[in-house]
From Swiss-Prot:
Catalyzes the formation of 4-diphosphocytidyl-2-C-methyl-D-erythritol from CTP and 2-C-methyl-D-erythritol 4-phosphate (MEP). One of its GO terms (molecular function) is 2-C-methyl-D-erythritol 4-phosphate cytidylyltransferase activity. Its EC number is 2.7.7.60. It is an enzyme of class 2 (transferase). It catalyses: 2-C-methyl-D-erythritol 4-phosphate + CTP + H(+) = 4-CDP-2-C-methyl-D-erythritol + diphosphate. Pfam families: IspD. Belongs to the IspD/TarI cytidylyltransferase family. IspD subfamily. It comes from Vesicomyosocius okutanii subsp. Calyptogena okutanii (strain HA). This is 2-C-methyl-D-erythritol 4-phosphate cytidylyltransferase.
Amino acid sequence: MSNDYYLIIPAGGIGTRMHSEKDNINRKIKIAKQYLKLDNGLTILDQTLKILLNIDQIKGCIIALANKDYLFTKSKFNNHSKLITTVIGGKKRMNSVFNGLKALTNLAKDDDWILVHDSVRPCVKASEIINLMNQLKHHETGGLLATKVVDTIKQASNNIVNTTIDRSNLWQAQTPQMYRFGVLLKALNTVINDGMNITDEASAIEYLRLKSVLVKSSKSNIKITNSEDLELANFYLTQYKE
């Protein structure tokens, strides 16, 4: 029996460090990053969904939204055939993803695959996601896209260097992070019940002492956190050929 692939997008962030949208009387208004417009006219979230929902292997999608999110109703993907439902995001990313997993309990089998992808990574390449699927299809747990660290890394206290970290075995985690449904559900349930604070799914898997596979990806798969990232994403998307 083949395994299905489901997508969870945690998009419940309400960070407002970037606010470039204007209202109908030309006032600047604060807006969550995932709803900022790219140069191609799409919001960051819609560009992200455009790439992922176009992948044939992905059967369905759950999106975790902020409690008072009114902007997703304007999304061109609001009624997409692959959108199973939206759920309310939690206080932290892990809670949002866990809520998404609970919404899949009547659909997904334990050995089906769950891809979790940041809503503000709109430059991910479909070919690299498919490569992730192919590399992990026989793995019992899962893994994630990542890039090798190339810069020299310093450990410091109060801006004073303590030591230089050996970068030869260091990787920078990206998304999607892809794990078996049953494993990821157990991992997130465990870290939440134990009061742990984690920032990605791979950390929850590590907490269960399970192993994740790193699959090399492009540095263009950036996470947009500031205006400089937004400019860089616009540049990368002009180079996007897929």
